[in-house]
């Protein structure tokens, strides 16, 4: 069978449906949540549109209270899972085109969710459609499981697997090719910096500080509001810093308050070194000013414990292993309010052989901050000799003529929600990863190639 030819036959429909899918703003918005739409109207619209497309094509579909859904084809006791998600991270600013216009330029579709994960989700859907339309005999059911809260708390899969059976094995089209069989553990933690009263009359009061939208994104913007007789002096110093460095920002005095804004570069938290943390940058500047005691303490904790360190060395939690590499640490959100104290939202990706308890114990014994929330998603590893891995290697090597090496990532995919699950694409080796960045895109050629790989993978696993 020539899987590439089958995909080319559906090329125009695949591109059209992918664009229409991407035009739905599916950023979680709990202000519009309600019965049957727990994560807001946009996420729900994206889920229902895909389920309706599945129903139209003759698949069995199911919506589980708006938390998740599935699209199924085939018969048998065993289930092959294809785990996708329709929610996306906030687009942020600085896009060349509207992040939800799904504009095509230079052979690419640009949109939030193009590569993470709505583009690959549509590729998987068309792969299943190809298997169905070719009337290929299957001995197992193939089930696309569609999540809606992957970018936040995974409440979708938690709800789904309370009500539905676990697939025998499966893959998530939500990372890199060839095959990812190891995923680091993921910790989301909040570190609280309690307010302490000033010992003397301050010359500059940190009124507020805010940076970051999600723990799994490096913050690309930060804002500090300052009051006091030192405003003009701090403003001048800030402008000098911008003039003499390559850092980007802006500042102004409005209604007696000094507002400082710093800009960085967002990226996925799995490798914070690919971005520039605007929150930490702004704290580094503020460290040089004469802030009030409480504000100074907040800034000091950030700079002492996180400046220039994405590996947790300053916190004494750094570690690594041969399977999955180094621990990474991202300060995804930074918040401070005068009289209330501060809070840092931390995202940690730790090696598959490491113990999260060691990290928790370190945080709980720290004197600089208090540990608030601590969420831990355990590491995931599937053996290299597992039939799932062997089958996907055969598919990849057969279609592309390249060795299907096994790799590990710091990102967390739905594959870890399965007992036997791996991530399989959509990002091909050598391609830049635009996920969670402005001007996110998917190469149309890669959309087609991944669809062909998914179609054969589905058939080989379920035949």
UniProtKB/Swiss-Prot annotation:
Zn(2+) 1 binds at residues 116, 151, 436. Disruption phenotype: Non-essential, it can be disrupted. One of its GO terms (molecular function) is acetylornithine deacetylase activity. The active site is at residues 87, 150. Keywords: Dipeptidase, Hydrolase, Metal-binding, Metalloprotease, Protease, Zinc. It is an enzyme of class 3 (hydrolase). It comes from the Bacteria. Its EC number is 3.4.13.-. Belongs to the peptidase M20A family. This is Putative dipeptidase YtjP.
């Amino acid at each position: 069978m020539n899987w590439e030819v089958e995909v080319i036959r559906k090329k125009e429909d695949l591109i059209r449906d992918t664009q229409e899918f991407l035009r739905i703003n599916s950023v979680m918005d709990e202000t519009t949540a309600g019965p049957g739409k727990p994560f807001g109207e946009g996420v729900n619209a994206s889920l229902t549109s895909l389920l309706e497309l599945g129903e139209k094509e003759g698949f069995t579909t199911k919506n589980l209270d708006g938390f998740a859904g599935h699209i199924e084809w085939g018969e048998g006791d065993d289930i092959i899972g294809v785990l996708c998600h329709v929610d996306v991270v906030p687009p942020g600013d600085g896009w060349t085109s509207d992040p939800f216009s799904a504009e095509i330029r230079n052979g690419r579709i640009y949109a939030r969710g193009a590569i993470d994960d709505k583009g690959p989700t549509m590729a998987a859907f068309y792969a299943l459609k190809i298997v169905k339309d070719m009337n290929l005999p299957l001995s197992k059911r193939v089930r696309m499981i569609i999540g809606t809260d992957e970018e936040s708390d995974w409440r979708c899969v938690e709800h789904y697997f309370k009500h539905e059976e676990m697939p025998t094995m499966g893959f998530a089209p939500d990372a890199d090719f060839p095959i990812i069989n190891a995923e680091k553990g993921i910790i989301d933690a909040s570190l609280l910096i309690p307010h302490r009263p000033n010992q003397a009359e301050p010359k500059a009061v940190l009124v507020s500080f805010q940076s970051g939208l999600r723990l799994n994104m490096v913050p690309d913007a930060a804002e500090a509001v300052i009051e006091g007789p030192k405003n003009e002096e701090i403003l001048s110093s800030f402008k000098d810093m911008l003039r003499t460095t390559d850092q980007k920002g802006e500042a102004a005095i409005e209604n007696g308050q000094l507002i400082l804004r710093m800009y960085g570069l967002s990226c996925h938290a799995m490798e914070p070194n690919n971005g520039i943390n605007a929150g930490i940058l702004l704290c580094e500047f503020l460290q040089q000013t004469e802030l009030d005691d409480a504000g100074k303490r907040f800034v000091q904790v950030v700079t002492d414990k996180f400046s220039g360190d994405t590996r947790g060395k300053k916190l004494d939690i750094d570690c690594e292993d041969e399977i999955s590499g180094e621990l990474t640490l991202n300060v995804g959100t930074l918040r401070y309010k005068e009289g209330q104290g501060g809070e840092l939202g931390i995202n940690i990706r730790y090696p598959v052989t490491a113990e999260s308890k060691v990290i928790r114990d370190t945080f709980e014994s720290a004197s600089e901050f208090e540990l608030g929330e601590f969420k831990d998603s355990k590491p995931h590893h599937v053996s290299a000799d597992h039939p799932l891995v062997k089958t996907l290697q055969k598919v990849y090597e057969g279609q592309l003529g390249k060795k299907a090496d096994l790799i590990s990532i710091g990102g967390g995919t739905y594959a870890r929600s399965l007992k036997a699950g791996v991530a399989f694409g959509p990002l091909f080796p050598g391609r830049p990863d635009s996920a969670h960045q402005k001007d996110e895109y998917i190469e149309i050629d890669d959309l087609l190639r991944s669809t062909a790989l998914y179609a054969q993978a589905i058939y080989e696993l379920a035949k």
